[in-house]
Amino acid sequence: MKILVTGGLGLIGHNVVRRLEAQGHKVAIIDNMTTYGMIPQSELDYLIAERQKKITGSLLYSASITSDTLDYICYRHKFDTIIHMASFPRQKVVNANPTLGADTMMTGLLNILESAKKHHVKRVVYISSSMVYGDFEDDVTEDAVCRPQGQYGIMKLAGEDLVKDYTRRGCFDHAIIRPSAVYGPLDVEDRVVSKFMLTAMRGGVLRVNGANETLDFTYVDDAADGIVAAALVPAAANQTFNITKSHSVSLLQAAEMIVKIVANGTIELRDKDADFPSRGALNIDRARAVLGYDPQVDVAEGFDNYHAWFKNSLYWAPKTV
């Protein structure tokens, strides 16, 4: 099968590409190789180089999904499937620059959908977010009413509706993925787990915004497995899937676990960040039944793996915190 992965050098993206390569699929990647200022360019260059080492046979196009290059790639390769992972990396970046966020998350998505329609792609897998739910408690299903808070979640939900509309018009089938708090080796520095881990390793203060706020932390290997299944399993057509560990852990618990694993760092409790919804664990029964999805890595093992990677990488240094 010929598959295009947008954002294929991202944290989840390069793990998806590795799995597709291992299964013998012909893969192409389009990636603009930026995190929109989340981390210094030198650190991003290191992460991209390390991710590329794990990819053996895929074609790489360094370009934006808003560029004409995307349509050229689709014309040249005649893809069966597009896995659309390219996006702004997190809510605070979109809130700080909503116009640029909309350019990537909406204009870029429309560019993909139009090229998919024009070049007869059979399936588009759209990576959405658990942020579309807004506030929710444990065991939220894909059929829950979505009330996103903030522009990131709103745009992700609008993206879902756009994808569904192209399917309604007979252009291609789709699968929609709602992941949560994905982490693991080769992640960037500005997400919860990576920030906690590096701060602890540098002997700093882990600032916990809302001790009892919970997240459904998901190890990157599990997330990648679910996305690949959604791209390949015929029964996934036109369905939405929560792809997470389906287990909520409080921010305080996560910080305490990391401090214990690293044997360094201290914890400071702060008020909840008002810009972020309160979240719990997602129900993954549909993904289990349809995709055979079975997440393997619990938080304790995942944090251990992540710490081991940091210790052996050139990414971290004992900076002043």
How should these model regions be labeled?
Residues 11, 89, 187, 249-250:
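Short alpha-helical
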Residues 200-321:
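C-terminal substrate-binding subdomain of Rossmann-fold SDR/epimerase-dehydratase oxidoreductases
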Residues 1-178:
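N-terminal Rossmann-like NAD(P)+-binding domain of SDR-like oxidoreductases, especially those catalyzing
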Residues 138, 149-151, 161-215, 220-229, ...:
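NAD(P)-dependent short-chain dehydrogenase/reductase
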Residues 109, 160, 193-194, 251, ...:
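A general structural signal for well-ordered alpha-helical segments in protein cores
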Residues 71, 113, 164, 194-198, ...:
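Solvent-exposed, non-membrane alpha-helical residues enriched in polar/charged side chains
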Residues 94, 180-181, 240-243:
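Short-chain dehydrogenase/reductase
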Residues 32, 39-42, 136-139, 187-190, ...:
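Short aromatic-enriched loop/helix-cap "lid" or pocket-rim segments at secondary-structure transitions
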